[in-house]
Amino acid sequence: MMTKNERRQPSWPMIAGVAAAAALVGFGAARGLGSPSGAEVSKLAAAPEKAAASAPAAEPAEVRIPGEYLAAANIAVEPVSAGGVGSVLLAPASVAAVPGSEAVIASRAAGAVLRIQRKLGDAVRAGDVLALVDSPEAAAMAAERKVAQARADLARKTYERESSLFQQGVTPRQEMESARIALDVAQAEVQRAATVAQAAKVSSDGRSVAVVSPIAGRITAQSVTLGAYVAPQAELFRVAGSGAVQVEAYVTAADTSRIAAGSDATIVLANGAPLAGRVQAVTPTVSGSARAATVVVTPVDANSGLIVGEGVQVRLHTKAADANAMSVPEDAVQNLDGRDVVFVRTQQGFRPKSVLVGSRSGGVAQILSGVKPGEQVATRNAFLIKAEMNKAGGDDE
């Protein structure tokens, strides 16, 4: 016998045609056979009741939904979490760059912006020149470098002469050693001046200072104008690398003791899409006007698509007081025919499962029974599956 799940859902034109044919057959039979007797009427009325009493309870229907529809309808699927409502914290968070993957780029000397070679949104490589600053300090550093080099050349010639005279027995050893010490000092001064000029990115002609990106990435901020005067260490560009990002969630000081590094977390995007994450660290102190502690969460998927500065939410899973408790996002629980259900993912779609719901708090519902931890259930936009199931049930009727 073909079950409900195996039947193809008929189209509305087919249903209308079948209904019309049944009406004609019934009308002809009524005319040909006449009205039934009273005993027959009683027997016919009792037959449906007897059939209904003997029929077994219908199994939950499965709604067949292709994977392409899930993406188009923005339906999210998440595992049932182990732990009750009290073991889940919903905290505001923001996406930040991992230390070392973002650079604030400033001018090393004061001056006027001579040239801008990169603009906002451009991709850059490590060592690329973003701008040139015409600076008197650059000329001073270049001159100091040349003076130090000239003194070193003079000290080298003096040492060579004193060394030759000492070997000929003309001058004592003390004068040769003094010349050698003077040469060492001059060479150290050359190295110092060259290091200062190199750190400031002084050009070869000594007229300008180059603003250079230390990392590869993309320019995400630009606060420089051609011809404008800039002060030393003033931010001109900001470059974000293409590396991993982290999510910084903010919790109260009382909640920090409930969160441990390595515990599971769920990152909830602005559109409701969930991303699996893991707690990397919890700051032991609070800071800021909100007096909140920071919980650092890293996405499990390195290619998560998170953008630095994006606002998100994080569900932090703490240790549950009841080992048998479970929880799901509140959107996952739907009311179907007067009962609370969740839609469990199957190979071809979803199947409703009746659940016993406990408390609800912070967008999370506690599940007392009906499912097992780890089962994949529909969360965001689960009501669309309910609508499809109601539609399928109406078509079957």
Curated annotation (Swiss-Prot):
Q: Which InterPro entries match?
A: Co/Zn/Cd_resistance_CzcB-like, CusB_D23, MFP_Cation_Efflux, RND_pump_MFP
Example of a GO biological process term: response to cadmium ion
Q: Which residues form a coiled coil?
A: 137-195
Recorded hits in Gene3D superfamilies, A to Z, give:
2.40.30.170, 2.40.420.20, 2.40.50.100, Helix hairpin bin
Q: Specify the protein's topology with respect to the membrane.
A: Single-pass membrane protein
- TM region positions: 10-30
Q: Which Pfam families is this protein grouped with?
A: HlyD_D23
- What cellular component terms from Gene Ontology apply here? cell envelope; plasma membrane
- Keyword annotations of the record: Cadmium, Cadmium resistance, Cell inner membrane, Cell membrane, Cobalt, Coiled coil, Membrane, Nickel, Plasmid, Transmembrane, Transmembrane helix, Transport
Could you cite one Gene Ontology molecular function of this protein? Answer: metal ion transmembrane transporter activity
Q: Does the keyword Transport apply?
A: yes
Spell out the PANTHER family in the cross-references.
CATION EFFLUX SYSTEM PROTEIN CUSB (PTHR30097), SLR6042 PROTEIN (PTHR30097:SF4)
Give the UniProt family note: Belongs to the membrane fusion protein (MFP) (TC 8.A.1) family.
What does the record give as the function of this protein? Answer: Component of the NCC cation efflux system that confers resistance to nickel, cobalt and cadmium.
What is the protein name stated in its UniProt record? Nickel-cobalt-cadmium resistance protein NccB
Q: Which organism is it from?
A: Alcaligenes xylosoxydans xylosoxydans (Achromobacter xylosoxidans)
Q: What is the lineage of its organism?
A: Bacteria, Pseudomonadati, Pseudomonadota, Betaproteobacteria, Burkholderiales
Its gene name is nccB
